[in-house]
């Protein structure tokens, strides 16, 4: 294991941020969660609220970011704070301020403060063009980047500014391109149906879902957390590049529904093949496996089982064997 270090996690009280904090704590590191929200509900549910220092701050305020990095003594930053797809679309100016200038504040802090050895940060599979551009093939980091959302555009810009900070200012960084994370305590959003396909049957509710024959990357949140830790600590000499695809298990919506039905025998899920999803899901993650040692631990069934048991426990229901 790497020696214990202090890691600042921006967006650290959010869904993915809380799991990243938990993962880092379990790996023996000191964690500071930097976020506009000091609601540690998810950290509490994960059992690490007492082990994580929560610092309230605004990622768009450079003074606030510098102060948090300096006062925490952080040697690594995991930068997750962002406005996601739907919020970005509805609040375009804020999306640019948070996603682009907020990221710039993080890179500026890393450039100015010698203590910071690495910034691991969230890009997104949203930087890729819509799926029709790839002829159903696996997509790797060399393929066409042409986002059709503002969110994706901010992430693409961040890949460019990260490159500049690395080449011109020697700021060590690793950016990851995850798709959509699923797991307990996810906030609802544009991909809420991905949560409902598990959550509703787990609690005995019926659910109807479209897109049955379309492929989704089912990426369990604990695997994404593992990926960010490895991105933060991978030795420089192991990195063949700076931006990596990461994914979980690729399966159709119908296959996911069938998996839920195996776990929850009385699940009432109706699946149709209507509609078309606008995301590129088939990410080749060979480079992340080779360079970062990224190795997803949760397949569809194991991820769904843990997710369902947590949901049922929350509702006072028995776990499913």
Name each model feature, range by range.
Residues 48-60:
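Rossmann-fold cofactor-recognition segment
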Residues 29-40:
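Conserved glycine-rich Rossmann-like NAD(P)H-binding loop of the short-chain dehydrogenase/reductase
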Residues 59-98:
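NAD(P)H-binding glycine-rich loop region in Rossmannoid oxidoreductase-like domains
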Residues 146-174:
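Active-site Tyr-X1-5-Lys
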Residues 7-27:
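N-terminal Rossmann NAD(P)H-binding glycine-rich loop of SDR-like oxidoreductase domains
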Residues 13, 163-216, 221-225:
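NAD(P)-dependent short-chain dehydrogenase/reductase
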Residues 210-213, 217-321:
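C-terminal substrate-binding subdomain of Rossmann-fold SDR/epimerase-dehydratase oxidoreductases
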Residues 104-150:
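Conserved Rossmann-fold NAD(P)-dependent oxidoreductase catalytic core, especially the SDR/UDP-sugar
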């Amino acid at each position: 294991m790497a020696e214990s270090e202090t890691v600042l996690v921006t967006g650290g009280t959010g869904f993915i941020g809380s799991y990243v904090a938990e993962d880092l704590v379990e790996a023996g590191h000191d964690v500071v969660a930097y976020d506009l929200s000091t609601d540690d509900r998810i950290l509490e549910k994960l059992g690490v609220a007492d082990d994580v220092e929560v610092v309230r701050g605004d990622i768009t305020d450079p003074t606030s970011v510098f102060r948090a990095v300096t006062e925490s003594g952080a040697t690594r930053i995991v930068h997750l704070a962002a406005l996601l797809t739907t919020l970005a679309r509805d609040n375009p100016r804020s999306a640019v301020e948070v996603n682009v200038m907020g990221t710039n504040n993080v890179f500026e802090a890393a450039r100015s403060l010698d203590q910071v050895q690495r910034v691991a940060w969230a890009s997104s599979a949203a930087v890729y063009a819509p799926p029709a551009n790839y002829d159903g093939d696996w997509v790797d980091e060399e393929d066409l980047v042409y986002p059709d959302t503002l969110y994706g555009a901010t992430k693409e810009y961040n890949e460019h500014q990260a490159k500049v900070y690395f080449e011109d200012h020697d700021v060590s960084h690793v950016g990851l391109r995850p798709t959509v994370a699923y797991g307990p305590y996810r906030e609802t959003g544009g991909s809420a149906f991905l949560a409902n396909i598990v959550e509703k049957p787990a609690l005995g509710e019926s659910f109807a879902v479209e897109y049955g024959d379309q492929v989704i990357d089912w990426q369990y949140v604990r695997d994404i957390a593992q990926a960010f830790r490895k991105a933060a600590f991978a030795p420089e000499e192991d990195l063949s590049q700076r931006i990596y695809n990461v994914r979980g298990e690729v399966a159709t919506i119908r296959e996911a529904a069938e998996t839920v039905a195996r776990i929850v025998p009385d699940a009432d899920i109706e699946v149709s093949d209507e509609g078309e999803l606008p995301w590129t899901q088939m990410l080749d993650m060979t480079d992340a496996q080779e360079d970062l040692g990224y190795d997803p631990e949760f397949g569809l069934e194991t991820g769904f089982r843990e997710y369902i048991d947590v949901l049922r426990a929350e509702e006072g229901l028995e776990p499913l064997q």
